[in-house]
Structures are given as structure tokens and as C-alpha cells.
Curated annotation (Swiss-Prot):
Pfam family for this entry, one: Ribosomal_L36
Superkingdom of the source species: Bacteria
CC per GO annotation: ribonucleoprotein complex; ribosome
GO aspect biological process, one term: translation
The family this protein is said to belong to: Belongs to the bacterial ribosomal protein bL36 family.
Keyword annotations: Ribonucleoprotein, Ribosomal protein
InterPro entries noted in UniProt: Ribosomal_bL36, Ribosomal_bL36_sp, Ribosomal_L36_bact
Protein name: Large ribosomal subunit protein bL36
Example GO molecular function: structural constituent of ribosome
Length: 41
């Protein structure tokens, strides 16, 4: 999982990427291709 300042560019890397808030943190998850996972902050 990558840790990034901005998730906007990561969201556009793959069409299945979703931005999700969990426990106050913002994550990018991808069910079909898990290597695109990322977290902000």
C-alpha cells in the first residue's frame, strides 16, 4: 500500500479504483487489481 499526499492522481490510474473513508483516513481500494491500493496521510 502506498502512502500519498494526494489521491486524485491515483484514482485515475485504473477504472475500478474507489475512494473510501475508513476511521478518518482516506483510502483508494481496487478489488480487481489490489496493487493500486493507497492511503492518504
Amino acid at each position: 500500500m502506498k502512502v500519498r499526499n494526494s489521491l486524485r492522481s491515483l484514482k485515475s490510474r485504473h477504472r475500478d479504483c474507489q475512494v473510501v473513508r475508513r476511521k478518518g483516513r482516506i483510502y483508494v481500494i481496487n478489488k480487481t487489481n489490489p496493487r493500486f491500493k493507497a492511503r492518504q496521510g
